Amino acid sequence: MYKIMKLKHFGSTEQKIYDLIAPVVSSLGYLIWDVRYEKEGASWYLRIFIDSETDTVSINDCEKVTAPVSDLLDEKDPIAQSYILEVSSPGLEADLVRESHFDACLGCEVRARGFRSFENGSREIIGVLTDWNKNAITLQTPEQTLELPFSALTFVKLYFEFD
């Protein structure tokens, strides 16, 4: 069974964290790609995904952001229960799940997977993201322009071709 792709919005905890840490992350020269507060097993995780407009994000960049963000979270204590803080890059093939992701990735090559095969017989399509709205994305492939409704998709990710 597949999950229908839906645009995600920050939950109240995630929004509170985003608002709190955004100035610190920005002052260090990074962007917040995503904030996820999620439970896995018995543990809660606060995952901060950072990006850069000028370069790829390295483990050193994540370390550079972790200390001041951790200090700020310890000082303000916005989450009552204990959690594990993780700061990482969204990766080369980052998930596009928020409105800001689709805005930032207009003109980028993406990979979209559907529940069923598309017209070309494949369940995946790679194309340039040329437009999007709350209901669908528009991809330009070498052969055609396709409008794909979110309700027919399981995911959309940045596409990177590994050699």
Which role does the model predict for each range below?
Residues 1-126, 130-163:
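Short Lys/Arg-rich amphipathic alpha-helical segments
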